[in-house]
Amino acid sequence: MSEAQETHVEQLPESVVDAPVEEQHQEPPQAPDAPQEPQVPQESAPQESAPQEPPAPQEQNDVPPPSNAPIYEGEESHSVQDYQEAHQHHQPPEPQPYYPPPPPGEHMHGRPPMHHRQEGELSNTRLFVRPFPLDVQESELNEIFGPFGPMKEVKILNGFAFVEFEEAESAAKAIEEVHGKSFANQPLEVVYSKLPAKRYRITMKNLPEGCSWQDLKDLARENSLETTFSSVNTRDFDGTGALEFPSEEILVEALERLNNIEFRGSVITVERDDNPPPIRRSNRGGFRGRGGFRGGFRGGFRGGFSRGGFGGPRGGFGGPRGGYGGYSRGGYGGYSRGGYGGSRGGYDSPRGGYDSPRGGYSRGGYGGPRNDYGPPRGSYGGSRGGYDGPRGDYGPPRDAYRTRDAPRERSPTR
């Protein structure tokens, strides 16, 4: 080896000298006078990170809480999940049980009675019963309801009837026992009747002679008062009359506007009437008696309940021994033979009756015409009085049915 080569070897770094010759693949060094290219630092390759699992998809029911939800110190914020867990056991209220009406012939023991209560206050002694054939007799109703207790009144109308007991227990028992029973091949509906509608009435004194109910209505109209009834006692004229109004407010106004005013040369006075006389109606039916039927018929009715479906008591129902006779041909004139007496003419139409009310059972469900029942058309008409269609059931008369010769009941005076 020459000296030049040895000198060059000595100038190399030790790492190069010690390395094997076959592993040295370096380029020969450049001349010192040649400019060296600047070395650009190589960028380090990015390190591959471990793959991250994607976030679990949220359930459809999970709704993210609002960003402005309040967070209190020392307490955790309530999330939507907490709210759902707190209300997951919330259940709607259970519906009330429904009791269907029993089939014909089945008793209702163990069930609440089917009152089918309608809006408004109901009587606890007066019952509404339907359906009945148009030719149903009062004696048949007495046989049905007589065993449950003394009755005050049985009133038969077209296709339905009202039965009033003296005691509430008797009425409740009648509903339980009779409701759903078959009569004339139809199940009966027995429910409580509505209470009489309240009446707003005033009595008038010192009316001029010749005054009629139309004159009183005109007087009220001139004073901007709405009326539902007007009446003047013209049979035995004593200068008294009455007006009825649809509300308490109008009644109060009438007391202020009509008291001590001059009317056809007379100064009239008016007073509130808190106990008005009952409204009489001409209809079928007419039994009244506080004692009810007692003692029983000897022979009973032919075949019991001939209509079928309802087995009456063995002993029938109480009453006079002679039984009932038939209806007289002239309408309601009492019973002709062996029964209750009565004048041939029947009812004497009061002088302050209905003008043209809408009566009868028309709308409504169980027991339930809206107005309970109204007077039949033409039953209360007449030339000396007029109702403008009052609404509501006014209940039973206070006294027994009057004959034509009986004195007329006058409006109470104070």
UniProtKB/Swiss-Prot annotation:
Involved in mRNA processing and export. Required for efficient splicing of a large set of pre-mRNAs by efficient co-transcriptional recruitment of the splicing machinery. Remains associated with the mRNP during early steps of translation elongation. Residues 33-51, 346-360 have a biased composition (Low complexity). It is found in: Cytoplasm; Nucleus; Cytoplasm, Stress granule. Interacts with RRP6. GO terms for cellular component: cytoplasm; cytoplasmic stress granule; nucleus; ribonucleoprotein complex. One of its GO terms (biological process) is mRNA splicing, via spliceosome. One of its GO terms (molecular function) is mRNA binding. The modification Omega-N-methylarginine is found at R302, R307, R314, R321, R329, R337, R344, R351, R358, R363, R377, R384, R391. Residues 1-11, 75-92, 399-414 have a biased composition (Basic and acidic residues). Methylated by HMT1. The methylation is required for nuclear export. Keywords: Cytoplasm, Methylation, mRNA processing, Nucleus, Phosphoprotein, Repeat, Ribonucleoprotein, Ribosome biogenesis, RNA-binding. It comes from the Eukaryota. The keyword Transmembrane does not apply. Residues 286-299, 379-389 have a biased composition (Gly residues). The modification Phosphoserine is found at S15, S79, S182, S212, S224, S356. Belongs to the RRM GAR family. The modification Dimethylated arginine is found at R288, R290, R294, R298, R307, R314, R351, R358, R363, R377, R384. Present with 78700 molecules/cell in log phase SD medium. Changing S411A: Shifts localization of the protein to the cytoplasm at steady state. This is Serine/arginine (SR)-type shuttling mRNA binding protein NPL3. Residues 1-119, 269-299, 343-414 are annotated as: Disordered. SMART domains: RRM. Residues 125-195, 200-275 form the RRM domain.
